[in-house]
């Protein structure tokens, strides 16, 4: 599943081709995604795209009439292509631009979404209760400590809670906890401020580095230009259960936590 770095890399890839361009058509071949795709042709045709933003794992394509809210789901991708590019399997939506290009949404598993919001997007039900962005100053040790106060949940589950901080999915939660030396099952409310300070710094550093490297390539993710990400070569624990720890040589443990695979080093990461 694309996580925050992959979505940000996609945003950076498509924005230069979209901003200040006029929409001349919207082609919906299959509107049966995670939620039905609304028929917004009348609203969006003729509109100029003002900016392309990201909130958590959502891409926001702004026009004066409203905002398209796009989520890549488990396997979705957005590509900038010439108008006459042949349609392939799972190419569900084309946003057609006056500059001779299209923004094409492809999603084999159809867990993605393309929605429309005419209200301030912060009021949309999908966005209204989201926590702070991890790469902004709003995500800091004071905020995290307050959010974790009294919580008995495992710290990894809290890191992946979008009400606490957005966009830290399974890959980067595993990696950040390893880098911070914190066991993923550690009780969140009992982690001291010093360790939380390290954790916040590692979350920021790892996400920023993943964006710089072009995202993590697993089964489905490619950049907006079709190129793979390269951060998978840098993973220390995710997907490496049973292999040796890159720090101490101990065998990495693999468990299920919150229905997600969790990999950690029992020597380097403590409760």
Swiss-Prot record:
Binds 1 zinc ion per subunit. Its EC number is 3.2.2.23, 4.2.99.18. Gene3D superfamilies: 1.10.8.50, MutM-like, N-terminal. Its cofactor is Zn(2+). Pfam families: Fapy_DNA_glyco, H2TH, zf-FPG_IleRS. GO terms for molecular function: 8-oxo-7,8-dihydroguanine DNA N-glycosylase activity; class I DNA-(apurinic or apyrimidinic site) endonuclease activity; damaged DNA binding; zinc ion binding. It catalyses: Hydrolysis of DNA containing ring-opened 7-methylguanine residues, releasing 2,6-diamino-4-hydroxy-5-(N-methyl)formamidopyrimidine; 2'-deoxyribonucleotide-(2'-deoxyribose 5'-phosphate)-2'-deoxyribonucleotide-DNA = a 3'-end 2'-deoxyribonucleotide-(2,3-dehydro-2,3-deoxyribose 5'-phosphate)-DNA + a 5'-end 5'-phospho-2'-deoxyribonucleoside-DNA + H(+). GO terms for biological process: base-excision repair. A zinc finger (FPG-type) spans 236-270. The keyword Ribonucleoprotein does not apply. CDD domains: EcFpg-like_N. This is Formamidopyrimidine-DNA glycosylase. It comes from Shewanella sp. (strain W3-18-1). The gene is mutM.
């Amino acid at each position: 599943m694309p996580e925050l770095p992959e979505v940000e890399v996609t945003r950076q890839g498509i924005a230069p081709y979209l901003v200040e361009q006029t929409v001349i058509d919207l082609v919906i071949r299959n509107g049966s995604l995670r939620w039905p795709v609304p028929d917004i042709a009348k609203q969006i045709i003729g509109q100029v795209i003002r900016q392309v933003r990201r909130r958590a794992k959502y891409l926001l394509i702004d026009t004066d009439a409203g905002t398209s809210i796009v989520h890549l789901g488990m396997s979705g991708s957005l590509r900038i292509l010439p108008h006459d590019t042949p349609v392939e399997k799972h190419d569900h939506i084309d946003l057609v631009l006056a500059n001779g290009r299209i923004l094409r949404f492809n999603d084999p598993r159809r867990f993605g979404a393309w929605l429309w919001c005419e209200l301030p997007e912060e009021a949309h039900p999908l966005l209204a209760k989201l926590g702070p962005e991890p790469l902004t100053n709003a995500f800091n040790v004071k905020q995290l400590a307050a959010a974790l106060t009294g919580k008995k949940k495992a710290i990894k589950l809290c890191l992946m809670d979008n009400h606490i901080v957005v966009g830290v999915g399974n890959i980067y939660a595993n990696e950040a906890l390893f880098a911070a030396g914190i066991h993923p099952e550690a009780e969140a409310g009992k982690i001291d401020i010093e360790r939380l300070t390290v954790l916040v710094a590692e979350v920021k550093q790892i996400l920023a580095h993943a964006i710089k490297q072009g995202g993590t390539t697993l089964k489905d993710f490619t950049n907006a230009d079709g190129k793979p990400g390269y951060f998978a070569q840098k993973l220390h624990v995710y997907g490496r259960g049973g292999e040796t720890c890159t720090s101490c040589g101990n065998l990495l443990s693999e468990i299920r936590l919150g229905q997600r695979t969790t990999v950690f080093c029992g020597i380097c990461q403590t409760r």
